[in-house]
Amino acid sequence: MKNKYLALGDSIVEGYKLQGKSFVYYLSKDFDIANRGMNGLSSNLLKYYRGDLKPFTHVIVHIGINDFLQGYENAQVEKSIVELVDIFKSEDLKIIFLKPIIIAQEACDYNWCSKTHYPLIKERLINYREFLDKLGQENNFKIIDLMDTTGIDIYDNLMDGIHPNLKLSKAMGKYIGTKLLQEV
């Protein structure tokens, strides 16, 4: 059976302000992949995704930043992620989680968060990234760390402290594609 990927998640998956050219667009040149990203999506909403999972062999998930921007605590987010993993496992999907970039303080200048809350959001994201590593090891699924995207300065290529510009989106697509090919 040919690998068929489903990309689920937030605005990073959708391609906020990139006219559909998120990392998924660049992956689609080499992979059979569907994009189901949605701006503003959080993990507690993603677990209610009821799209058809049957045609897919793999699911690529990027989620979590909005949860922390909306004030959710790690325990709440982790519970939702475990529920998601259980859903994907029950559908026999190979799971790939993308560890999100730790947002830049510049996000506060664009009103994504307040300067008062930024340190807490950053701390929660750091803890969440560690949680994903542990969960991936325990459940034998792939983790791709977007902070490791090669050949580009990540923070110089965020439009607003959170969202990749076109250059970073393309680099992320290339990096993720390289990691996916290592699996084959």
Q: Where do the model's predicted regions map?
A:
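Alpha/beta-hydrolase-fold catalytic nucleophile elbow
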Residues: 62, 98-99
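Substrate-gating cap/lid alpha-helix
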Residues: 107-146
